[in-house]
Design a protein with these regions (language model features):
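Non-catalytic all-alpha helical scaffold/repeat segments
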Residues: 101, 105-579
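Generic structural motif
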Residues: 11-14, 28, 52-54
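Short, mixed-charge low-complexity intrinsically disordered segments
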Residues: 40-123
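Phosphoinositide-binding peripheral membrane targeting modules
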Residues: 20-26, 41-43
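Charged, amphipathic alpha-helical segments
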Residues: 27-37
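Surface-exposed loop/edge segments in extracytoplasmic proteins
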Residues: 15-22, 56-61
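Short aromatic-glycine-(Arg/Gly/Cys) micro-motifs in beta-strand/loop hairpins
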Residues: 1-20
Length: 579
């Protein structure tokens, strides 16, 4: 997916239901035409085209609706407001430290936090960071207003009232940090001193607040995300053996690491340069699995120390953050390998093979299937499939390319969609005309049979599998009928034994497609077997070839086994031979 793409959404029914994504395209006019066509053909009650612009600095997309049409009037929503809608209202300063409040602040202030190389917990416990934040003015006020607008949409209070309430809460919380900094509540500590502090604080009601204040000071000396992560992980060595102090320090470290990993800027810096999203995800998976991560530019000390912690199943919140990030990226719109769909599919399979080994309490099987199904859905639309087939010169090559797609996507509905692209290729006149032009008929028929065999082995549902197989069989029948291939064998080879042996070899070599063509070949073969004197003549011929003699029953059994291998039941074979 390029830096800019256009998403087409539709709404079905006039009751104002939710919007569902139909397709993502790189061409603006093509996306608009597709949306208008859906309205004209009655495929949607309302449509919307959204321009998505990728911002490499944050790893996120900026959305802009460029077209809406249809009869259903739906209240327009701001995506950024929707992202904040789950924010639980805060009624006292302590509520600002809750998990949901911190996650909301991370989403709203992500860009600013990334530039400052801060986590939200550091910001909320550092007087110097809060002074810098207040000095921005607009960033602070915009954050408050965004939350207020989201809350006002779900309450009877006005935006102005909620802004005032949030400003009062934030001011109280900020001034508390300033006051505690002045009275030196947050000790400036070095490694080796945090364990004793955690033990001392124990079950104190303000223990987490005080410890985080000291951790924020300690991390303030780190100039890079890697240095910050390494400084945190060093503290794992001084965890108290047991008791409230151990849980206190471990949870504080885990939370700070998780916040780093939830930030796009921090994670990108920790993983180093990657050529594309696919390779970045591979590194994420390696990290999640607790194996060595190959980070460019000689960095990676922090990320590999974290991998070692994950290998010991430590830091569950941080590991869950990585799992969530992997799933989010898999479900996202950005291509794994933008320059090549072949590489895209290889990368998708590679990621799948690794993640299967990692499923468990952090990554469920259902979540993985849902993520891969969502990504697969974006690959079975017109634009990527046409791009994937553009190097194919003939229709059979296009069909083969689509079978490669089938092998690398997940989801029954996605495979059903893919089958709708395959049937028209097979039923087109070009399919037979372009199929190994100039090659001998057996070679052309074998090519169709090989494609059919791949379809029958595929993961298509039985309905789609049978439809494609029947279409290929029909194409093979037309090729055979046009060349009068079987008729020529019957006319050219008068000897029933030679004719039967020829047909048996052709069937065993996979020349004929399963279905009507194979049945036609079997009927011709059975007719040869049923010729008077076939068996006695066949045995006499074998006796000439084998001076040691032959056993009649053994000959019949061998022949029946060969015939069973091409789908003729032993009883039918024996009946024909006895004629």
């Amino acid at each position: 997916m390029s830096q800019v793409h256009f998403e087409i959404f539709r709404q079905q029914g006039k009751s104002g239901g939710g919007w569902s994504l139909v397709e993502a395209m790189e061409n603006r006019e093509a996306a608009l035409d597709r949306a208008r066509l859906m309205l004209e053909e009655g495929q949607a009650a309302a449509v919307r085209v959204v321009k998505e612009t990728y911002q490499s600095s944050t790893g996120d997309y900026m959305s802009l609706t460029i077209f809406e049409g249809g009869h259903t009037e739906v209240k327009k929503k701001n995506k950024k407001v929707e992202d904040i809608a789950s924010f639980t209202p805060c009624f006292k300063p302590d509520d600002l430290y809750s998990y949901h409040a911190r996650m909301t602040m991370t989403r709203i202030l992500g860009e600013w936090l990334g530039r400052q190389k801060l986590t939200v917990t550091e910001l909320m416990h550092s007087a110097s960071a809060l002074e810098k934040f207040e000095a921005t003015g607009t960033t602070y006020q915009h954050a408050v207003q965004k939350v207020a607008v989201a809350q006002a949409a779900e309450s009877e209070s006005s935006v102005a009232q909620i802004v005032k309430q949030l400003n009062d809460l934030c001011t109280t919380a900020i001034h508390r940090v300033y006051k505690d900094e002045r009275r030196k509540l947050f000790a400036e500590l070095e490694p080796g001193q945090f364990g004793p502090l955690a033990t001392k604080l124990g079950a104190n009601p303000d223990a987490r607040y005080v410890l985080n204040g000291s951790l924020a000071k300690y991390l303030g000396h780190a100039k890079t995300w890697d240095a910050k992560l390494q400084r945190l992980l060093v503290l794992m060595e001084e965890l108290p053996a047991e008791g409230p102090g151990r849980a206190l320090l471990l949870t504080a470290i885990d939370t700070l690491v998780a916040e780093m990993l939830n930030g796009a800027a921090a994670l990108a810096d920790l993983l180093g340069h990657n050529p594309d999203l696919g390779h970045a995800l591979l590194n994420l998976v390696e990290l999640f699995m607790g194996t060595i991560v190959n980070v460019a530019d000689g960095a990676g000390g922090g990320i590999n120390a974290l991998a070692r912690s994950f290998a010991k199943d430590e830091l569950p919140e941080a590991r869950a953050a990585i799992a969530g990030r992997i799933l989010a990226e898999l479900k996202g719109l950005k291509r794994l390998c933008p320059n090549s769909l072949d590489d895209e599919f290889k990368m998708l399979r590679r990621l799948g093979n690794q993640l299967v080994r990692g499923q468990g309490k952090y990554l469920s099987h259902q979540d993985l299937i849902a993520a891969f199904t969502e990504r697969s859905r974006r690959l079975v639309t017109q634009e990527p499939l046409q791009q994937f087939m553009q190097m194919s010169k003939t229709s059979d090559e296009k069909l083969e390319r689509l079978l490669v797609v089938e092998e690398n996507i997940v989801g029954a509905e996605n495979k059903r969609t893919l089958s709708t692209f395959m049937i028209p290729i097979i039923t087109s006149n070009n399919f037979e005309d372009q199929l190994l032009t100039g090659a001998p008929i057996p070679q052309r028929l074998r090519r169709v049979a090989e494609l059919q065999e791949r379809v029958l082995r595929s993961g298509f549902q039985d309905v789609q599998k049978n439809l494609i197989a029947v279409a290929l069989d029909a194409a093979a029948q037309r090729i055979e009928a046009r060349a009068k291939f079987l008729a020529s064998i019957e006319a050219r080879i008068a000897n029933p034994i030679e004719r039967a042996q020829t047909l048996l070899k052709l069937c065993a070599a996979g020349i004929f497609t399963q279905g009507d063509l194979m049945m036609k070949a079997r009927r011709l073969l059975m007719a040869s077997l049923a010729k008077p004197g076939f068996l006695s003549t066949y045995i006499a011929q074998l006796e000439q070839e084998r001076p040691a003699g032959v056993d009649k029953d053994q000959v019949v059994a061998e022949l029946a086994t060969q015939l069973e291998g091409i789908g003729i039941a032993p009883e039918d074979a024996l009946r024909a031979l006895a004629a």
